[in-house]
Amino acid sequence: MTYGNVYVAQIAMGSSDAHTVRALQEAEAFDGPSLIIAFSHCIAHGYELNEGPDHQKAAVNSGYWPLFRYNPAKASKGENPFSLDSKAPTIPIDEYLASEGRFKVVNDQSKATGEAAPAEGSVLANVRHDVNARWNLYEQLSKGWRLA
């Protein structure tokens, strides 16, 4: 997105079919390179694959995987090229991380300290910070703030 001439979208098919289709159609129609970053569940995530769509929704709803589209063609029309297509997080990131076996070390470290809130510098505290910082950046971009 910092180059300003590449279509970029982040999708999660299990979270929103409509968003996925819209992003793929825009990417195909864009006259230039396009990049689609797709959330793809797998057995190594530590849950049954038939639960994949639910986990994708949780990833989006926790802010771990925000849905967005960046379409440079909109900028040439005077429109904001960045669209933040998911709502602000509605579930705690801790809840999402606890639902997946791949994040077991994060959850175990948090439980080992015995503290209600993760200690500063812990993996969980860093994940919370990163999720919040990324969400805030995307929110600013959706309001017209420019990367470059």
Please tell me what each predicted stretch does:
Residues 7-12:
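Short catalytic-loop micro-motif centered on adjacent basic/acidic residues
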Residues 13-21:
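Active-site glycine- and acidic-residue-rich loops that bind
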Residues 1-4:
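Phosphate/pyrophosphate-binding betaalpha-module
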Residues 20-140, 145:
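Glycine/aspartate-rich loop-and-adjacent alpha/beta segment that forms the canonical ThDP
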